Curated annotation (Swiss-Prot):
GO molecular function, one term: peroxiredoxin activity
Reaction catalyzed: N(6)-[(R)-dihydrolipoyl]-L-lysyl-[lipoyl-carrier protein] + a hydroperoxide = N(6)-[(R)-lipoyl]-L-lysyl-[lipoyl-carrier protein] + an alcohol + H2O
Origin: domain of life: Bacteria
Protein name: Alkyl hydroperoxide reductase AhpD
Disulphide bridges: 131-134
EC number of this enzyme: 1.11.1.28
Stated role: Antioxidant protein with alkyl hydroperoxidase activity. Required for the reduction of the AhpC active site cysteine residues and for the regeneration of the AhpC enzyme activity.
Gene3D superfamilies to which the protein is assigned, alphabetical: AhpD-like
């Protein structure tokens, strides 16, 4: 399955989603590694099998297998961190902010790819998962590494398009 296959599954009520998928596929704001890593990480974070399969297939052959593995790791580790740190951020009891997380997250310091690319993928997944604390932390690392606002915005735009594709497919499944 490819992005074109995925677009063909998007119903007419979500025509804008199809058009956004096309724009995303041809977007050259990011490096290929950043772009296809986002496809994989956000496809997994969408929790939709069709979206995940299409975007992983789209990335295969365009980037090294290590990029795909690292993007999978970003989605996985953010699945954990986003839940934990969203709780810490939203809980009225501020004591949780001073407690050690006691969560293993070694992959963040050694992702097997460029750390900035991994941060970009982590930011996008954090946007999908709605963790403001994680969004701020990853955006801060990216800005300190001189990543442009346009690149950061592109990553979050990709995340929003990918999530909307998953929702469109779920909505179509109700018909």
């Amino acid at each position: 399955m490819s992005i074109d296959d995925l677009k063909s599954k998007i119903p007419d009520f979500a025509k804008d989603v199809r058009l956004n998928l096309s724009s995303m596929a041809s977007d050259e704001t990011l490096t290929p590694q950043q772009k296809y890593g986002l496809f994989v990480a956000c496809g997994i974070a969408s929790r939709n099998a069709d979206v995940r399969k299409a975007l992983v297939a789209e990335a295969a052959g365009k980037v090294d297998a290590s990029v795909i593995q690292a993007a999978k790791a970003a989605a996985s580790i953010m699945g954990m961190n986003n839940v934990y740190y969203r709780f810490v951020h939203l809980a009225s009891n501020k004591d949780y902010r001073t407690m050690p997380a006691r969560l293993r997250m070694n992959v963040i310091s050694n992702p097997g790819v460029d750390k900035i690319d991994f941060e970009l993928w982590s930011l996008a997944v954090s946007a999908i998962n709605g963790c403001g604390m994680c969004i701020d932390a990853h955006e801060d690392v990216l800005r300190k590494a001189n990543v442009t606002a346009e690149a950061i915005q592109a990553a979050v735009r990709f995340a929003s398009i990918i999530q909307s594709a998953a929702i469109a497919l779920e909505a179509a499944d109700t018909e």
